[in-house]
């Protein structure tokens, strides 16, 4: 009698779906108002001029223009601004 024992079970095989976080528009690139600049968890990047913050800490443009990254303050916080197009 050809037989095979039970294959057993595994406890592996799960992983969470990636959240696609990170910088979406880089320094010097043009952007339209309402477009997402950075998707992040917490305020790794802080909002500057013409940049708004969503409830999940997403940074988005409040005006058309060019994205500008800088470091500000005594704590050297990375800040994102949008220099408005004339």
From Swiss-Prot:
Family matches, as InterPro entries: Ribosomal_bL27, Ribosomal_bL27_CS
Xref: NCBIfam families: L27 (TIGR00062)
Top-level taxon of the source organism: Bacteria
Disulfide bridge positions per record: none
UniProt-annotated stretches for the region Disordered: 1-20
Name of the protein: Large ribosomal subunit protein bL27
PROSITE patterns: RIBOSOMAL_L27
Cellular component, GO annotation: cytosolic large ribosomal subunit
HAMAP family: Ribosomal_bL27
Molecular functions per Gene Ontology: structural constituent of ribosome
Record's keyword annotation contains Transcription: no
GO biological process: translation
The keyword Ribonucleoprotein belongs to this UniProt entry's keyword annotation: yes
Organism: Bordetella pertussis (strain Tohama I / ATCC BAA-589 / NCTC 13251)
Sequence ranges of Gly residues compositional bias: 1-10
Family the UniProt entry places it in: Belongs to the bacterial ribosomal protein bL27 family.
UniProtKB keywords: Ribonucleoprotein, Ribosomal protein
